[in-house]
């Protein structure tokens, strides 16, 4: 058995988990998430915990059991506490502001960049150079943050661009004559 899958997923109070065959639905204060578990993995619910077990005695099934446990844990954490990713804008004139369901970015292009906020995600701009992406689905939060960063990734000479708040950009030295 996978070392990750051995540990059960604790379901906190206020979070409701429904198992229907291979379909798992997790509902909590921050939202609702659904996912279909692979056929090689069995999920059991007992005593406020979710237990994951591989159906086959195969390396891939054991690996899938560990992955399933991690994804279920992310679902439970997401609907109870939520996930967030912080981005910061570095550069002269680089700005961000939220208008309704759109994120408006000024990133030094000849045109402003409008990013429509997907369903299940909330985007805040506490200041003009900060963006906070929040949501219940960890994968979707990371994907949206990566899409925003991709508009203008940090360049290696001055570090201008959109970067994650915890990202370290290693700067190159300019060419010398």
Swiss-Prot record:
NCBIfam families: L6_bact
This protein's name: Large ribosomal subunit protein uL6
Keywords: Ribonucleoprotein, Ribosomal protein, RNA-binding, rRNA-binding
Native species: Alkalilimnicola ehrlichii (strain ATCC BAA-1101 / DSM 17681 / MLHE-1)
Source taxon at top rank: Bacteria
Subunit structure: Part of the 50S ribosomal subunit.
GO CC field: cytosolic large ribosomal subunit
Reported function: This protein binds to the 23S rRNA, and is important in its secondary structure. It is located near the subunit interface in the base of the L7/L12 stalk, and near the tRNA binding site of the peptidyltransferase center.
A GO biological-process term: cytoplasmic translation
Family the entry assigns: Belongs to the universal ribosomal protein uL6 family.
GO molecular function: rRNA binding; structural constituent of ribosome
């Amino acid at each position: 058995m996978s070392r990750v899958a051995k540990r059960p997923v604790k379901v906190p109070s206020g979070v409701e988990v429904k198992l229907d065959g291979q379909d798992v639905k997790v509902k909590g204060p921050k939202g609702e998430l659904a996912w279909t578990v692979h056929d090689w993995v069995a999920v059991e619910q007992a005593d406020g915990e979710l237990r994951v077990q591989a159906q086959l005695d195969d390396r891939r099934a054991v690996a899938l059991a560990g992955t399933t446990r991690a994804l279920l844990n992310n679902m439970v954490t997401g609907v109870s506490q939520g996930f967030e990713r912080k981005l910061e804008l570095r550069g002269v004139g680089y700005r961000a502001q939220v208008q309704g369901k759109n994120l408006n970015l000024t990133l030094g292009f000849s045109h402003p960049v409008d990013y429509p906020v997907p369903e299940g995600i909330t985007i805040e701009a506490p200041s003009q150079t900060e963006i906070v992406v929040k949501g219940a689905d960890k994968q979707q939060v990371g994907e949206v943050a990566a899409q925003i960063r991709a508009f203008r990734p940090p360049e290696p000479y001055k570090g201008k661009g959109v970067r994650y708040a915890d990202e370290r950009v290693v700067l190159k030295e300019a060419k010398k004559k």
